[in-house]
């Protein structure tokens, strides 16, 4: 029903309509706020997704950067590493007459000289083409992986025998004619069967007469005649022994007769020399060397007089081992040492055993040098007391004289 504008109902109806109109924008505002909140929430979700995506992108970029750095480092290490291989693929096209151009860091191998094992790794000494021998380097097997053919050839050369070495061994082992006998490992000469067969050394009692004995036997008549001509007295027993033996080449000897038979002087002869005041050295008789076809041994030194003195006076009935003054023409060292041992082994030989006391002394000046001679009273091995000069003791019993001097030493400390 249509109503006018002034109708109260109409007015009343219009009022609620206006109120409806007024409520509509409020509802619209609430819906807009809801939509804005939803949009904001969506924007925040998108922002978070964007942030997460950006973070993921940053992580990916960092990983890419790290991977790039690692690749760059690996490339740098590959460039800096001393890999020395020969690669035909890396070589540039070769012009005729010019050496091949290799990639950077690669060098051409001329030959392999030696091989060694260092710290458990196999290494080869490489000779580089175009470089001197002083530039050779030891390279591990890993650096020569592309040169297996050269390494195989080198190993084959090592395994194959060298003919030059065999020739050298043959030369060193071939004995030279007329050379010295071969030696053992320690340098000792190898003895032949002939050198091993040596005659066993006979016992001392079975030894034949030595050179001095043979000379005395052959020249016995000359020696006796010479002594008689010089006015010396020869022991009767010696003359009788020589006459009894005759021309025999071997003299039967008792232990006392093992002394050298060149010259034997009696006690009377010694006393005669002492009475006349002549020294023993002036009355020495030289025995001429044996002549004939007899062997006297090789001379190992110059001939000279070997003097054996014993100034002690033997008693009566001492037999043939009395005091001796011997001068022998030395022909060989063997005869000398043998006679010396025999002389020392004589059981009846008399010697000084003790110096009792000094008796007198005499001073003399010779060539402006004062010399003192001391006479001692000494005890002999046969129990007799004799007078002995210090010179005789020095010649025959030096140790006994030194021992006596040491016993007589006196020490007076100065205050």
Curated annotation (Swiss-Prot):
Sequence segments annotated as region (Disordered): 1-102, 158-209, 273-318
A GO CC term assigned to this protein in UniProt: nucleus
Pfam families registered for this protein in UniProt: Chromo
UniProt KW Nucleus keyword: yes
UniProt cross-references to PROSITE patterns, sorted A to Z: CHROMO_1 (PS00598), CHROMO_2 (PS50013)
Keywords (A to Z) from UniProt: Chromatin regulator, Nucleus, Repeat, Repressor, Transcription, Transcription regulation
Segments passing through the bilayer: none
Bias-annotated ranges (Acidic residues): 10-81
Subcellular location: Nucleus
Function summary: Structural component of heterochromatin involved in gene repression. Recognizes and binds histone H3 tails methylated at 'Lys-9', leading to epigenetic repression.
Domain comment (free text): The chromo domain specifically binds to dimethylated H3 'Lys-9' while the chromo shadow domain is required for dimerization.
Protein name as annotated: Probable chromo domain-containing protein LHP1
Organism in which the protein naturally occurs: Oryza sativa subsp. japonica (Rice)
Lineage, opening ranks: Eukaryota, Viridiplantae, Streptophyta, Embryophyta, Tracheophyta
């Amino acid at each position: 029903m249509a109503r006018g504008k002034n109708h109260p109902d109409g007015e009343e109806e219009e009022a609620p309509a206006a109120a409806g109109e007024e409520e509509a924008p409020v509802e619209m505002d609430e819906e807009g706020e809801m939509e804005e909140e939803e949009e904001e929430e969506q924007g925040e979700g998108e922002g978070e997704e964007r942030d997460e995506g950006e973070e993921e992108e940053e992580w990916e970029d960092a990983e890419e950067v790290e991977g790039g750095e690692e690749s760059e480092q690996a490339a740098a290490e590959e460039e800096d590493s001393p890999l020395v291989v020969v690669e035909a693929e890396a070589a540039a096209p070769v012009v005729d007459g010019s050496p091949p151009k290799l990639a950077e860091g690669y060098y051409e191998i001329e030959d392999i000289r030696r091989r060694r094992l260092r710290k458990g790794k196999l290494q080869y000494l490489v000779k580089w083409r175009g470089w001197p021998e002083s530039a050779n380097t030891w390279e591990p097997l890993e650096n020569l992986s592309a040169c297996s053919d050269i390494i195989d050839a080198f190993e084959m050369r090592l395994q194959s025998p060298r003919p030059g070495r065999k020739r050298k061994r043959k030369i060193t082992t071939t004995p030279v004619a007329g050379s010295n006998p071969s030696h053992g490992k320690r340098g000792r000469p190898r003895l032949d069967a002939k050198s091993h067969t040596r005659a066993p050394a006979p016992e001392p009692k079975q030894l034949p007469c030595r050179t001095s004995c043979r000379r005395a036997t052959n020249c016995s008549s000359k020696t006796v005649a010479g002594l008689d001509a010089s006015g010396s007295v020869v022991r009767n027993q010696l003359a009788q022994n020589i006459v009894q033996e005759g021309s025999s080449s071997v003299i039967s000897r008792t232990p006392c007769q093992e002394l050298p038979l060149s010259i034997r002087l009696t006690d009377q002869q010694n006393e005669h020399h002492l009475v006349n005041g002549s020294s023993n050295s002036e009355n020495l008789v030289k025995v001429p060397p044996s002549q004939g076809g007899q062997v006297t041994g090789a001379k190992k030194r110059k001939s000279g007089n070997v003097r054996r003195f014993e100034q002690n006076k033997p008693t009566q009935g001492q037999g043939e081992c009395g005091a001796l003054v011997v001068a022998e023409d030395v022909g060989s060292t063997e005869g000398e040492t043998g006679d010396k041992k025999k002389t020392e082994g004589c059981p009846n030989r008399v010697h000084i055993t003790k110096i009792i006391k000094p008796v007198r002394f005499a001073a003399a000046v010779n060539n402006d040098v004062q010399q003192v001679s001391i006479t001692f009273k000494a005890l002999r091995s046969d129990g007799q007391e004799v007078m002995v000069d210090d010179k005789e003791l020095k010649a025959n019993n030096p140790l006994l004289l030194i021992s006596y001097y040491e016993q007589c030493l006196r020490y007076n400390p100065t205050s």
